[in-house]
C-alpha cells in the first residue's frame, strides 16, 4: 500500500481534534511538572543574581570566555541552573511522550481515556522513555554543536524510537537502531514532519519572552504547554505513520 504524507497529516489532524481536550490536559500537566521541577531544583534568586557580579559580559568573545571569567561559585550556580532546566525538561518530555502514545493506544482499542489514566498507564515505561529521550537529546545536541546538519539528521533518524519503544516494547538501543533503519527507508515521510516540528519549536522559543508579560511562572507554563502541544502533534503523526508502515 502506498503511503502519502497528506493522508497521514489528515489522520493526525482528525485525531488531534477529536482528542484535543485530553491532549491539552496532558500537555498542561507536563508543562506544570516541568516548571515546578525546574523551580525546585534551580538555584535561588539570590544565587542567580550572583551570576552578574563581576562578569565582564561586553569583554567576552564567547560563551566559553564568559564561563572562564566566572568565579568557581558562579560556575557552580550556572551548572546547577543548567542541570535543573535539562532534568525538568527531560522528565516533562518523557511523561508527555508516554501519555500521548498511551492515549493513541487506548483510543485505538476503543477504550475511554483521560489525561490521568493515560499518564498512569504510561508509568511503567517512563524510566526507559526518560533514558531514550536523554540519549536522543544528547546525540542531537552534539551533532548541532559540530556542524548543525548532523544534529538535524539524528533528530530525524531517531524520531520513531519512542513509538517503537512503547508500541513494540523494544529496548532502548533496539528502538534507536530500528528507528534509524526504518526512518532512512521512509525519509520523505518523516523528515518534513520533524523539520516542521523543529521550526515550530524554534519560532515558539523566539516569542517565549512575550509570555512573561503575565508572570514568569504562568508564562513558563503557557510556553511549555504550547511546546508540548506541538510535540504531541508530531507524536500522533509518527505513531500513525509507523502503524501504516508496519502493515
From Swiss-Prot:
Subcellular location: Cell inner membrane
Taxonomic lineage of the native organism: Bacteria, Pseudomonadati, Pseudomonadota, Gammaproteobacteria, Enterobacterales
Membrane topology: Multi-pass membrane protein
Main location: membrane
Keywords: Cell inner membrane, Cell membrane, Membrane, Transmembrane, Transmembrane helix
Keyword Transmembrane appears in the UniProt entry: yes
Protein name: UPF0259 membrane protein YciC
NCBIfam families per record: PRK02868.1
